[in-house]
């Protein structure tokens, strides 16, 4: 009813569920505007940048190619106001976004896009430039002299694990297949038996089907 398009939805007992809803997002669609504003309000109302992460459901409604634009919206309240002025006439009746004057600093952006997610995931060698870090480094042009979105969309230099992969804004032809990053957080091992009981009562498959076997570890 929202879009008039066909949709697909499926559920397989309690193991999985998936769905496809084709959406054409439009500036003058109030529902779409509120969807967008909800995320922006969370970013701007949560005072501690360590408690919010810049992440999207790529490649669906929020491709990561939009990160530079999102960063500009967070760092520049004037640009945010100009964008809001083109939205649905009743936008301000349903959201507080227009009244929020906060602007993210470069440090805030580094936290929500790098340091915060790495810390939350327990990746001790990611998200910082200290001893033992993997030397994942991006070098940008000066934000004060350039459009924010353009700066973040086109880094001047990028180092991945200490190896340069972007030079003078150009991608070098030395990329390799990436690695799967894993972490091993501490937990109460007694919880496994409780989960196993639930599997036996409610699931059609065994909990052992969820374990990752050794043959998948070669790229970890």
Place the predicted regions along the sequence by residue.
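Active-site microenvironment of metallo-dependent hydrolases
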Residues: 45-52, 62-220
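Active-site core of metal-dependent hydrolases
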Residues: 1-42, 48-64
């Amino acid at each position: 009813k929202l879009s008039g398009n066909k949709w697909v939805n499926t559920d397989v007992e309690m193991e999985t569920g998936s769905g496809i809803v084709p959406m054409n997002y439009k500036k003058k669609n109030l529902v779409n505007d509120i969807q967008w504003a909800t995320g922006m309000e969370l970013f701007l109302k949560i005072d501690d940048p360590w408690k919010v992460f810049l992440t999207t459901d790529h490649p669906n409604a929020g491709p990561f190619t939009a990160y530079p634009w999102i960063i500009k919206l967070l760092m520049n309240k004037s640009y945010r106001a100009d964008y809001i002025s083109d939205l649905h006439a009743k936008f301000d009746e349903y959201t507080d976004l227009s009244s929020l004057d906060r602007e993210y600093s470069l440090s805030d952006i580094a936290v929500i896009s790098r340091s915060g997610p790495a810390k939350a995931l327990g990746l001790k060698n990611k998200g910082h430039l200290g001893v033992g870090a993997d030397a994942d480094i991006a070098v940008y042009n000066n934000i004060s002299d350039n459009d924010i979105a353009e700066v973040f969309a086109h880094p001047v230099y990028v180092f991945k694990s200490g190896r340069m992969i972007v030079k003078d804004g150009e991608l070098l032809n030395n990329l390799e297949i990436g690695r799967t990053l894993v972490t091993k957080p501490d937990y109460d091992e007694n919880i496994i038996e409780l989960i196993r009981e639930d599997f036996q009562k409610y699931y059609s498959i065994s909990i052992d089907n969820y374990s990752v076997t050794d043959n998948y570890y070669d790229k970890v």
